Regions:
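STAS-like cytosolic regulatory interaction modules
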Residues: 1-41, 50-89
Length: 89
């Protein structure tokens, strides 16, 4: 499981993106991003999650987000990408 940090904004996205790329490759067939710690974020968090999804699917793995904050789900809907980022309880 990939654990998202408490803050994932434009300022931290580039650094975290590198870490996430490596983590996706090390995951088994199902890649799950745990967003339970995420409290401060902007649209960069969506970009990171979409990139993670793209990498997982390219590697033949499934992708989902666990415990996404309501505001993140709202932001995904606003940008029209809510259907691309499956959220589990």
């Amino acid at each position: 499981m990939l654990k998202l940090p408490a803050a994932l904004t434009h300022e931290s996205a580039a650094d975290f993106s590198q870490t996430l790329r490596q983590a996706v490759l090390s995951q088994p067939a199902e890649v799950v991003a745990d967003a339970s710690a995420l409290t401060e974020f902007d649209s960069s968090a969506l970009a990171i999650l979409l990139e993670c999804r793209r990498q997982a699917l390219a590697a033949g793995k499934s992708f989902s987000v666990q415990a996404a904050p309501p505001r993140l789900r709202q932001l995904a809907g606003l940008y029209g990408v809510g259907g691309l980022i499956p959220v589990t309880a």
